[in-house]
Amino acid sequence: NDGDLDILSAARIDDTIALYTNDGASDPSWSATDITTSADGATSVFAADMDNDGDIDILSASKDDDTIAWYENSGGPFWSASTITSSADYAESVFAADMDNDGDMDIISASANDDTIAWYENNGASNPSWTAADIATSAD
C-alpha cells in the first residue's frame, strides 16, 4: 500500500509464490519475499483485498495439488494461508471480482481436467468463508 507497483510470481517447478517489492526509486531495486514454497505446481496468482481490511492479499492456483488458496496479508512478513478448495482438478487460473455486487471480493477459478469455471462466493466477514458454485463444467 505504498503506491509502488510490485510483482507477484507463481513458479510451477519449485512450488513458490513470491512477492517482489519495488523500492519506488526511478531505477528500482526489488526485494523478494516467498509467500509460500508449498503451492504444488503453482500456475496463477492474483492480488486483491479479500477481507476488506485495506491491504492486498494474494490468491493462487496450483495444478498439481488441485488447490485454490488465499494468503492473508497480516501486515508483517508472514502470510496466513487458507485453502479455498483442493478439488479444482488441475487448477490453471484464479481471479477475484465482486461477482454479486455485495461489496466484497469473490474468487473465480478455472481448472483443466474437469473443464470447470468455478465461483467461490465471499460471505463478507472479516475472516471470510467461501461458498462454491460452478459457472461452467464444460469449458474445454
Go through the PLM ranges and name each one.
Residues 1-4, 23-25, 48-55, 63, ...:
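Calcium-coordinating acidic loop motifs
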Residues 1-9, 53, 130-140:
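Intrinsically disordered, low-complexity linker/propeptide segments enriched in Ser/Thr/Gly/Pro
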Residues 5-11, 58-62, 107-111:
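Hydrophobic beta-strand segments that make up the repeating blades of beta-propeller
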Residues 12-13, 51, 63, 100, ...:
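A generic beta-sheet turn/junction motif
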Residues 14, 42, 65, 91, ...:
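Short coil/loop residues immediately preceding or within conserved phosphate-binding loops
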Residues 16-20, 67-71, 116-120:
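A short loop-to-beta-strand structural motif that recurs across blades of beta-propeller domains
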Residues 21-40, 72-89, 121-140:
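Blade-edge motifs of beta-propeller repeat domains
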Residues 43-50, 83, 92-99:
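Beta-propeller blade termini
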